From Swiss-Prot:
GO terms for cellular component: cytoplasm. It is an enzyme of class 6 (ligase). GO terms for molecular function: ATP binding; histidine-tRNA ligase activity. This is Histidine--tRNA ligase. It comes from Synechococcus sp. (strain WH7803). Its EC number is 6.1.1.21.
Length: 441
């Protein structure tokens, strides 16, 4: 019988990787707590219409990449391909929009049927922030600063912020007509995908990865040139506030977000840790989405970062600077004590001691192999624990445990098993030298 494997693009997270993810999530959780951003959790499965209406029928996400199916009630359901639409749906459904401005964050898996590659899988994970009910240029910059400062706190180096303004729907409509006319005159120079997008979603051509198309677009009209005076003034405010906060940025007039609901400020944050500028975070303003989904007109801005790409960047940062924040983040904390035990009576006593110490708040790793003491001590050394708690049948019969220091010179200490508080005190102290231990005897 053949061995079962995970689906292509659906990757297991093993314990070492999971520790890194938990460390990133812990930093993010604390970062958001200090900013007054509250966590929200939404279902993985939503009605397909949510994304068709929210993301846009003409997008690649809806047209080519969603995992959709009919359930037993003949309802079309979709595994969420992104987090924003679900958060907005939840805020509408539960009346959060009636309670004033909302700052929400989420973390979890998303699903898109794409070609798997490093840092980009079919099941991928995001950490995202959605600020609902805020309309000012200042709120745009606060959202950008939240993302920028989180990445800096995680130890990501070589950060670069790119910004653009997508203006209002009216601005984009005027620009769309101008861009289409310009591109139609050069249709034969476009790649096949861009030729198709010319009629379905022409703004997405600006984001083409085709080098020939990108070279052609160097002379194309820009959206910034089509902004109304009000939109241009708003974007100038965003830039001024970024300068005020000392967050460096550059204008990218070709920057468009991949989803239809974006308008006004759009941004991406990249890092050069992987050798080339790789996008680790993207977002923007989406004032029309709530109304598009059947709710009241509600201004909003948000962003998301991809965990898989971020972890690759952090691993590169840790290698480049072994003493830096990224390296510290990816290190796992060792147990405080490793319990070495052998013998039928000893194993039962060791289990009781382990539980008592854990209940007292001590991080304990119990060796359950039953191997010879020599092999267990090798594992104890590899664990990084500063102490080994040794229990053989002799110690079990005498009702004692032998505490042996592993990371520095020091004498063994024998303590009664009936006094776990004394054992905890020793474990939380520096090991004593052999001479000190002999004097106490």
């Amino acid at each position: 019988m053949s061995q079962l494997q995970s689906l292509r693009g659906m990757v297991d997270l093993l314990p070492e990787q999971t520790r890194r993810w938990q460390a990133v999530e812990a930093v993010a959780r604390d970062h958001f707590r200090r900013a007054g951003v509250e966590e929200i959790r939404t279902p993985l499965l939503e009605v397909t219409e949510l994304f068709a209406r929210g993301i846009g029928e003409g997008t690649d996400v809806v047209g080519k990449e969603m995992y959709s199916f009919l359930d037993r009630g003949e309802r079309s359901c979709t595994l969420r391909p992104e987090g924003t639409a679900s958060v907005v749906r939840a805020a509408m459904q539960h009346g959060l929009l009636n309670q004033g401005a909302q700052k929400l964050w989420y973390a979890g898996p998303m699903f898109r049927y794409e070609r798997p590659q490093a840092g980009r899988q079919r099941q991928f994970h995001q950490i995202g922030v959605e600020c609902l009910g805020v309309s000012s240029a200042r709120s745009d910059v606060e959202a950008i600063a939240l993302a920028w400062d989180l990445l800096a706190a995680l130890g990501v180096q070589g950060l670069e912020l790119e910004i653009n303004s997508l203006g209002t729907p009216e601005d984009r409509q005027c620009y769309r007509a101008e861009l289409v006319a310009w591109l139609e005159a050069r249709r034969d120079q476009l790649d096949a995908d861009s030729q198709q997008r010319l009629t379905t979603n022409p703004l997405r051509i600006l984001d083409s990865k085709n080098k020939a198309t990108q070279a052609l677009l160097a002379d194309a009209p820009t959206l910034l040139e089509a902004l109304s005076p009000e939109s241009a003034q708003r974007f100038a405010q965003v830039q001024a506030l970024l300068h005020q906060l000392g967050i460096p940025f550059k204008l990218n007039t070709r920057l468009v977000r991949g989803l239809d609901y974006y308008g006004h400020t759009a941004f991406e944050i990249t890092s050069d840790q992987l050798g080339a500028q790789a996008t680790v975070c993207g977002g923007g303003r989406y004032d029309g989405l709530v109304e598009q989904l059947g709710g009241p007109a509600t201004p909003a801005i948000g962003w998301a970062l991809g965990m898989e790409r971020l972890l690759l960047v952090l691993e590169a940062a840790a290698k480049a600077d072994p003493a830096g924040a990224a390296a510290q983040l990816t290190m796992s904390a060792p147990p405080e004590v490793y319990v070495v035990n052998r013998g039928e009576a000893a194993e039962a006593v060791a289990l009781s001691l382990t539980r008592s110490l854990r209940l007292a708040g001590v991080a304990v790793e119990l060796d359950g192999s039953g191997a010879a003491f020599g092999k267990q001590f090798k594992r104890a050394d590899r664990s990084g624990a500063p102490w080994a708690a040794v229990i053989g049948d002799e110690e079990a019969a005498s009702g004692v445990v032998c505490l042996k220091p592993l990371l520095r010179e020091g004498g063994d200490q024998r303590l009664p098993l009936s006094d776990p508080a004394a054992i905890v005190t020793i474990l939380h102290s520096a090991p004593k030298s052999s001479l000190e231990s002999e004097e106490e005897r």
